């Protein structure tokens, strides 16, 4: 696990050459076909060294949930373990990890009518007013959700209106836990400035590789639009705004870099608040040092 641009892929390839592992991608962007440059998808050469499961499995017009991921990942893990090898899950989509490790809480599906009612109420009293209502109903969720985060406020209230139970109550009712012994490692540079520099350098490299042309090709499709989960991926939505004429290219690049840094910050926040025990690895340490640490811990838990 780890934030974007932390070196997860390189370490996974090194592990693939050292241990009897098979890689499963845990990334909500890498699942999409035709979105290679902006997602920093492993190259053909990298995939030959370490094939990744659960990448390029969907068209950008399709949606995918944490529940879908859990089902697919469990299937792949069963197949890998049956062959006598070890599943190595690699990626930065923390919600997918959470769903896999803890199961899924029984939250209801969205109800368009109730959402419309909530939005109508927001027009009358504002989202700050609805946030105060949420604080009264579900103090824990209310304190966790930013007063300006209308999407999450809407969802938390919607869940309560549908079920009569708060989001906090329902998320405590998790599904089946993962039926495997799990070792968890997180990789990130200790110095946040290093990660920020890597993100900026990688974004400019993606531009050199043809990221704009990749988005132009997607935008030319009549079935794709900016509100799809695929196009909302960081970098893609900013480049889409540029192609729509809403911002300049320089602004798109700047906003894309900023959005990627914000994503990395959220990923690190998730990891620091993780309930399970995690072994942290410094991205700047030699690969050999990281491999030795992983092998040492693994040998005490798994028969290699």
UniProtKB/Swiss-Prot annotation:
Q: Report the protein's function.
A: Catalyzes the transfer of a dimethylallyl group onto the adenine at position 37 in tRNAs that read codons beginning with uridine, leading to the formation of N6-(dimethylallyl)adenosine (i(6)A).
- In which residues is substrate bound? 4-9
Q: Which cofactor does it need?
A: Mg(2+)
Q: Name the reaction it catalyses.
A: adenosine(37) in tRNA + dimethylallyl diphosphate = N(6)-dimethylallyladenosine(37) in tRNA + diphosphate
What is this protein identified as? tRNA dimethylallyltransferase
Q: Which NCBIfam families match?
A: miaA
Q: Which InterPro entries match?
A: Dimethylallyltransferase, IPT, P-loop_NTPase
Region spans: Interaction with substrate tRNA = 27-30, 151-155, 232-237, 265-272
- For the keyword Cell membrane, the answer is no
């Amino acid at each position: 696990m780890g934030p974007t641009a932390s070196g997860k892929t390189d370490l996974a390839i090194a592990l693939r050459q050292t241990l009897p592992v098979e890689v499963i991608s845990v990334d909500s962007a890498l699942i999409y076909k035709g979105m290679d440059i902006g997602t920093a998808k492993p190259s053909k050469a990298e995939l030959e060294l370490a094939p990744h499961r659960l990448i390029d499995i969907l068209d950008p017009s399709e949606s995918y949930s944490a529940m879908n991921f859990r089902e697919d990942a469990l299937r792949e893990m069963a197949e890998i373990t049956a062959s006598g090898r070890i599943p190595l899950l690699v990626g930065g989509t923390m919600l997918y990890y959470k769903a896999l490790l803890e199961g899924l809480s029984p939250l209801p599906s969205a109800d368009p009518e109730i959402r419309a009612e909530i939005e109508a109420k927001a027009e009358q009293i504002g989202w700050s007013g609805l946030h105060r209502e949420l604080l009264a109903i579900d103090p824990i969720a209310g304190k966790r959700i930013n007063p300006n985060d209308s999407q999450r406020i809407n969802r938390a209230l919607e869940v309560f209106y549908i079920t009569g139970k708060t989001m906090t109550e329902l998320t405590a009712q998790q599904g089946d836990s993962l039926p495997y012994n799990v070792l968890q490692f997180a990789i990130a540079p200790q110095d946040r400035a290093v990660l920020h520099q890597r993100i900026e350098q990688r974004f400019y490299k993606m531009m050199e590789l043809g990221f704009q042309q990749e988005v132009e090709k997607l935008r030319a499709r009549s079935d794709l639009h900016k509100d799809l989960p695929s196009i909302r991926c960081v970098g893609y939505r900013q480049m889409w705004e540029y192609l729509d004429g809403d911002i300049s290219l320089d602004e798109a690049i700047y906003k894309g870099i900023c959005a990627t840094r914000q994503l990395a910050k959220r990923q690190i926040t998730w990891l620091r608040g993780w309930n399970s025990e995690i072994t942290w690895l410094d991205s700047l340490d030699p690969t050999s040092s990281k491999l030795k640490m992983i092998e040492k811990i693994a040998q005490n838990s798994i028969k290699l």
